[in-house]
Amino acid sequence: DWTDLTMDVAPYQTSKTKAEQYLWDFMKEHEGKTDMEAVAINPSMVFGNSLSDDIGASNLVVKRLIDGSLPFTLNICINIVHIKDVADMHFEAMINDKAPGKRFIASNNHMFFPEIAKVLNDNGFKAPKRKLPTFLARILGIFDKQISFFLRDIDILRIYDAKNAKDILG
């Protein structure tokens, strides 16, 4: 399924969706004119080591959970994948004859932010122990743009189906 761009979607998701749609339009337009193949790998929230000082947006969320800049969590579910698994998928997609022309979701698990905070606390970090109640988040969202952006995702279980990727790419 495609991200519904008629909804209130973050610029990041919009750019990713449009880029992939352009890829498939390009491939269709050049079908039979080139031997080029395409595969789309759509990772969920990517965590893991960074090769540079830029830790990336996903790792920044964890950093903010443990550095005290987030005093509470919101009950938001995210799907997660390790950077090494994403790299392995890219490699496998290049050498697997069943991959061309397909779209794959890279996701290993899903967790709500309070669960993530608990895992961090259980491993010696000082993540928030409080979850902001939904009613209070909705009130604060009127004044805080960051909280407002996440309101549509509070208390919603989202599980990305990566079965296709696991079946074909391993």
Model regions and ranges:
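Glycine/proline-rich active-site loop of Rossmann-fold NAD(P)-dependent oxidoreductases
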Residues: G32-D35, G48-V61, A93-R103
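Substrate-positioning beta->alpha
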Residues: A57, F72-M94, K102
